[in-house]
Amino acid sequence: MDAPWAREQLRRRYLFPSEVELDCEDEAKPETPTAVEKKERPLPRLNIHSGFWILASIVVTYYVDFFKTFKENFHTNSWFLFGGALLFVSLSIAFYCIVYLEWYRGIEEYDVKYPTLVPITTATFIAAGICFNLALWNVWSFFTPLLLFTQFMGVVMFISLLG
């Protein structure tokens, strides 16, 4: 690679494509790919990664009696109520963004128009996760974050299969 060519490429790296075309009219343009080459095959929804998390979530639910434990400890700890309220707020904002703003109003980039919605949703969801960890800590001890994260990933991967 010769030095003048490298300097010229370095100089052109921040130019807009139209400026680059004007700058190098004498150079030959590479062929543009056809529509068939541009069209990429969509990724399959069910892959090894999502299958693993869904299966792991099912195994965790079965072996730790997740729903039975949740039902027995629901009324004994106030962290469940606080975590549930935060989770409700987080999911409400998410549904507001997806259903109302994107589907009904047609705002595709709602995160640009309303930049505080995504951080608020994320913060409330993380706070809800911390509350659920505190509520179930006396049951599973240091396994609680691992079990809840596995459940979370299983739900996320299952939802990704649906849509």
Curated annotation (Swiss-Prot):
The chain crosses the membrane at residues 47-67, 79-99, 117-137, 142-162. It is found in: Membrane. Keywords: Membrane, Transmembrane, Transmembrane helix. The keyword GTP-binding does not apply. It is a multi-pass membrane protein. One of its GO terms (cellular component) is membrane. This is Transmembrane protein 128. Disulfide bonds: none annotated. PANTHER family: TRANSMEMBRANE PROTEIN 128. InterPro entries: TMEM128. It holds the Pfam family TMEM128. It comes from Mus musculus (Mouse).
